[in-house]
Amino acid sequence: MRASDVERYRQYAKTCQDTDYGKPDSVRAHNRAVTSMYKTVEKAAAEGNQAIQALAILLDEPITREWLAFQLLDKGCDVPPDLEQKCLQIIQGIANDPSRYADAFASREWLKRWEQKHQSSSR
């Protein structure tokens, strides 16, 4: 994972943050950025723990932390337990934020699916 990959991930997250949902071109740019973020996470997963750790610095940045928390866990990356817990704490923070009604609801649903998946895989 090169520093340029991490910087591009930041840029993709900024594109998503700046999305104007009333403008189709902006929405298309948002969708391309999300796809590119997932590709970056997949690349890190393929490269292994050191690459995941390099990308994980973005969990401490406001614009990237939420995107990366979901994406690391969604992609089934071999995330070390401490990073998994950090990602889950970020997602739980969204789920418990009453000022973010739609995001909170979606995060609670995501957490339910996560827990179901991991309960069944630990049996």
Model-inferred region functions:
Residues G22-D25, K39-E42, G76-L83, S121-S122:
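Short coil/turn connectors between adjacent alpha-helices in alpha-solenoid helical repeat scaffolds
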Residues A3-V6, A46-I57, P81-G93, S120-R123:
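Amphipathic alpha-helical scaffolding segments comprising HEAT/armadillo-like alpha-solenoid repeats
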Residues H30, V34-M37, R65-E66, E84, ...:
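Residue-level detector of extended alpha-helical repeat arrays and alpha-solenoid scaffolds
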Residues D60-K86:
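Mid-chain, well-packed structural core segment of small domains
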Residues G48, G76-P80, E115:
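Alpha-solenoid repeat junctions
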Residues Q85-R123:
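Short, Lys/Arg-rich amphipathic alpha-helical interaction segments
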Residues T40-K43, Q71, K75, W110-R113:
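Core register positions within helices of long alpha-helical scaffolds
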Residues M1-N49, Q53:
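N-terminal interaction/assembly modules
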